[in-house]
């Protein structure tokens, strides 16, 4: 006797088959990778940073989506060992991406935009990494007990080597291009200021503070409002006008963040143009002081424009492979490898090419420069001396105490004597 399936049972059976398929290793991996692709699309195309058109992320976002979708498609066709290894690496990377977005949840203004899909990356990455671990463990059951455990030890050692030297550099590249916006702090400049804004050549609106000059000279202090205000307050106390502003992707300014300072020279060029447009600023008496990434950006801006009449660069180091290859001896090996991967990753995540080498740029600066290397500095900061040697114009070098950007706190009187004296000579002619 034949039976006829009830019509309502067919959708239920289909749903059961779908759930069963998704519950497999391949199904779960594809769900996790799909969440990753969703966040990439959201981050790059649906909800980019303020002032940034989606087309600016086209090829970088396309590469990321293609890699995730390609892995999801090829996943069941890969050998178990390769499948598990890739799942662990990509899963860890997704956790890092999600953790960066989760930082927004600790802010007063809470998450917004692509932070929500970014937060989903944490459980999705954990799921994918867990799948990878289980897959590798199951794939190594053949052979003798000694051989099985030897394989597992070899895999563990391989992970210990490849994670810090392959995966983490790419994770760092993601972090430096997706850093959270710093709060705008309370101004402590020792004088009244104006809230100002200006536009870069690529259409971004930047915001900052301006203290008018009392002695006829003006200095741009960087890394802007989020950075140490002590050098700016020192100059204000000496009568200098000072401009501090949020660079692209930070504070109240438009644009994508980039902790390595790529494209930052455009921000300084816009700041100079703004100062030159003000009737209370003498265009022949504009200087700049930059710390860390700000010091690197000052060197590039000084090389690419004659509008800076004097520049102080403190703590300049490495911002891409183009600087790392100039390290000496054995110190060149690890930084060159790591920064090679960081540079490659940043190029993709920022959809941008690395800026010119600071060695080459330093040789093009024609205006006076004071190079400060506060020892012991961070990795790559020893290149400050090479930047100084490459410079062909009027230059000074101060091997200060205090560590990275710590010269002011370590030697405040000497800092004042050197910085104020440098600007007095080159901006005021005294």
Where are these regions (language model features)?
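An N-terminal hydrophobic leader/cap segment in hydrolases
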Residues: 149-199
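Hydrolase active-site cap/lid region
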Residues: 300-351, 361, 382, 386, ...
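Alpha/beta-hydrolase active-site loop
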Residues: 258-279
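Conserved alpha/beta-hydrolase "acid-adjacent" motif
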Residues: 377-384, 407
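Conserved alpha/beta-hydrolase
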Residues: 232-254
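Catalytic histidine-centered segment of alpha/beta-hydrolase-like enzymes
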Residues: 403-416
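Short beta-strand/loop motif that positions the catalytic acidic residue
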Residues: 364-366, 371-373
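Short beta-strand element of the alpha/beta-hydrolase
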Residues: 216-224
């Amino acid at each position: 006797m034949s039976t006829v399936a009830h019509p309502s049972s067919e959708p239920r059976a289909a749903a059961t088959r779908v759930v069963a398929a998704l519950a497999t290793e391949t199904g779960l991996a594809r769900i996790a990778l799909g969440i990753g692709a969703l966040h990439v699309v959201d981050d790059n195309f649906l909800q980019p940073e303020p002032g940034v058109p989606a087309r600016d992320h086209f090829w970088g976002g396309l590469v990321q989506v293609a890699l995730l979708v390609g892995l999801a498609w090829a996943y069941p066709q890969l050998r178990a060992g390769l499948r598990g290894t890739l799942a662990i690496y990509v899963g860890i990377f997704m956790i890092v991406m999600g953790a960066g977005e989760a930082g927004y949840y600790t802010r007063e203004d809470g998450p917004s935009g692509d932070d929500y899909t970014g937060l989903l990356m944490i459980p999705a990455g954990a799921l994918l990494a867990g799948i990878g671990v289980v897959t590798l463990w199951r794939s190594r059951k053949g052979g003798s007990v000694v051989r099985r455990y030897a394989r597992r030890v070899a895999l563990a050692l391989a992970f210990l080597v490849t994670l810090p030297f392959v995966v983490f550099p790419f994770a760092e590249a993601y972090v430096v291009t997706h850093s959270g916006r710093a709060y705008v702090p309370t101004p402590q400049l020792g004088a009244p200021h104006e809230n100002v804004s200006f536009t870069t050549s690529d259409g971004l609106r930047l915001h900052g503070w301006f203290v008018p000059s009392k002695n006829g000279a003006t200095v741009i202090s960087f890394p802007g409002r989020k950075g140490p205000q002590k050098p700016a307050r020192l100059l204000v106390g000496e009568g200098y006008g000072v401009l501090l502003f949020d660079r692209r992707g930070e504070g109240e300014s438009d644009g994508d963040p980039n902790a390595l300072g790529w494209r930052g020279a455009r921000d300084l060029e816009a700041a100079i143009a703004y100062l030159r447009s003000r009737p209370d600023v003498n265009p022949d008496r504009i200087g700049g002081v930059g710390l860390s990434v700000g010091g690197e950006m000052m060197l590039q801006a000084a090389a690419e424009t004659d509008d800076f009449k004097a520049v102080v660069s403190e703590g300049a180091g490495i911002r891409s492979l183009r600087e790392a290859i100039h390290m000496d001896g054995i110190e060149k090996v690890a930084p060159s490898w790591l920064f090679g991967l960081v540079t490659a990753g940043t190029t993709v995540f920022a959809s941008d090419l690395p800026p010119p080498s600071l060695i080459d740029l330093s040789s093009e600066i024609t205006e006076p420069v004071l190079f400060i290397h506060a020892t012991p500095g961070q990795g790559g900061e020893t290149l400050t001396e090479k930047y100084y040697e490459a410079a062909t114009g009027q230059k000074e070098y101060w091997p200060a105490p205090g560590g990275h950007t710590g010269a002011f706190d370590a030697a405040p009187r000497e800092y004042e004597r050197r910085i104020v004296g440098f600007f007095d000579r080159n901006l005021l002619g005294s």
